[in-house]
C-alpha cells in the first residue's frame, strides 16, 4: 500500500491542504491507498474534535488511515521549545490523569473510525527509549518497561461506553442543601456538576477515588 504520511495532520488548515493535495494526486492517477497521521501529541492538543474531523474528511478519499509515531507527552512544548529530558523525574497525578484522558479520548475516536483506521504505531515502547525522554512520560510503558495505567485504559476498554446514551432526566441530588441545584443526578446514576473556572484549561473531578483517577472536563473552542 502507498501512503502519504505527514505531521500536524489534524490541524484544520493543514488537514484541508493535505486533503486537497491527495485528492488532486489521486484524480491524476497517483495510486495513493492511504493517509498516515503522525501522532506526536500532548496532554492538551490537538483537540480530539480536530482529530475526529480529520479522520472523517480523509476517509472520503482513502480507504486506509494509519496513526503513525504515536506518543502523548506530558507537556505542551512544541518544536524548538520541546524539552528533550533524558532524566527520570516525578510527574504529578494531575498530569497523569490528563494524559490518560487524552489517550482514552483518542482511542475512542479511533474505534469510531475503525472501518478506515487499520493501524496504530507507537513511537517506541517505553518512556526510557522515547525520543522526547522519560520525563515527558509519553508512552504506555514506564522507564522500567512496566505497563502504566494508560496501557489498560487503551487495551481493556468498555465497548458499551463508546456509544453510551445518557438520559437527560437530571434532577438535583437528594443530598444537596436546600436551594442547591448542583450536583445533579439522573436515573442511570450519572452526575452533573457546574464548575466555574474561567482561567482553567481543564478541571479534574475525582470522587472517592483516593487520587487514583478522575474525570477530566475540558473546555471546547468557545471556552466552555
Language-model segment annotations:
Residues 180-185:
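Short beta-strand segments of immunoglobulin-like
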Residues 15, 77-78, 132, 205-208:
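Short, solvent-exposed loop/turn and secondary-structure capping segments
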Residues 194-224:
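Aromatic-rich carbohydrate-binding modules that target alpha-glucans
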Residues 162-178:
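A general sequence property marking short-to-moderate contiguous segments
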Residues 1-82:
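Noncatalytic carbohydrate-binding groove/subsite architecture in carbohydrate-active enzymes
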Residues 189-193:
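Structural beta-strand segments of beta-rich domains
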Residues 46-66, 70-162:
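Aromatic-rich peripheral "rim/lid" segments of glycoside hydrolase catalytic domains that contact
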Amino acid at each position: 500500500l502507498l501512503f502519504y504520511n505527514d505531521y500536524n495532520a489534524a490541524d484544520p488548515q493543514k488537514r484541508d491542504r493535505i486533503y486537497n493535495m491527495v485528492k488532486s494526486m489521486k484524480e491524476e492517477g497517483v495510486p495513493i491507498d492511504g493517509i498516515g497521521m503522525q501522532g506526536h501529541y500532548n496532554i492538551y492538543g490537538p483537540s480530539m474534535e480536530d482529530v475526529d474531523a480529520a479522520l472523517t474528511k480523509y476517509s472520503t478519499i482513502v480507504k486506509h488511515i494509519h496513526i503513525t509515531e504515536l506518543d502523548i507527552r506530558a507537556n505542551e512544548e512544541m518544536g524548538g521549545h520541546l524539552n528533550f529530558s533524558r532524566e527520570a523525574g516525578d510527574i504529578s497525578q494531575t498530569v497523569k490523569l490528563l494524559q490518560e484522558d487524552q489517550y482514552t479520548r483518542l482511542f475512542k475516536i479511533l474505534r469510531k473510525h475503525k472501518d478506515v483506521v487499520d493501524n496504530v504505531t507507537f513511537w517506541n515502547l517505553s518512556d526510557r527509549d522515547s525520543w522526547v525522554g522519560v520525563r515527558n512520560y509519553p508512552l504506555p510503558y514506564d522507564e522500567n518497561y512496566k505497563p502504566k495505567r494508560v496501557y489498560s485504559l487503551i487495551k481493556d476498554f468498555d465497548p458499551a461506553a463508546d456509544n453510551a446514551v445518557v438520559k437527560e432526566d437530571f434532577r438535583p441530588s437528594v443530598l444537596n442543601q436546600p436551594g442547591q441545584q448542583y450536583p445533579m443526578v439522573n436515573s442511570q446514576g450519572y452526575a452533573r456538576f457546574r464548575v466555574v473556572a474561567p482561567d482553567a484549561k481543564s478541571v479534574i473531578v475525582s470522587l472517592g477515588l483516593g487520587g487514583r483517577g478522575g474525570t477530566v472536563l475540558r473546555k471546547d473552542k468557545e471556552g466552555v
